[in-house]
Amino acid sequence: MRADNLLFSPDGQSVALIDWQGCCIAPPVFDFAYFLIQSMTIEDRQRLEDNLLRFYAEELERGGLKISLPNLREVYESSLIYSFAIACSIPLINDPSIPRVRELAIAMGTRSIQVLKDHGQI
């Protein structure tokens, strides 16, 4: 999650999240995976990933969408490359000479490569 994508109400009591960067038709798990990979440190994601996947499955079921944890994991793992693709696009659609853009691209790329390694995809 990036602060650029948060809209706060004038009184500071509510917040909205927007992001039009990756508009596509895909399973909702793609958004969850992208959020998990790109909003946490590598160490935190590695430590919390299983618990957060379980929690996500429980919340989906609570909302009326029953999905088994093994099925959710399968879809989650199929979505990991999406995060890498978005990371690769950062220096292409932004000016990489800007330090903030460069730092973002490096962080996103590093996180994306590590999750692919962690799941045996590279």
Please tell me what each predicted stretch does.
Residues 6, 67-72:
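A short glycine-rich, hydrophobically flanked beta-strand micro-motif that places a catalytic Asp/Glu
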Residues 1-28:
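Active-site acidic catalytic loop and adjacent metal/ATP-binding pocket
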Residues 25-64, 80-100:
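Active-site activation/catalytic loop segments of kinase-like enzymes and analogous catalytic loops
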Residues 13, 70-122:
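Regulatory N- and C-terminal appendages and interdomain linkers associated
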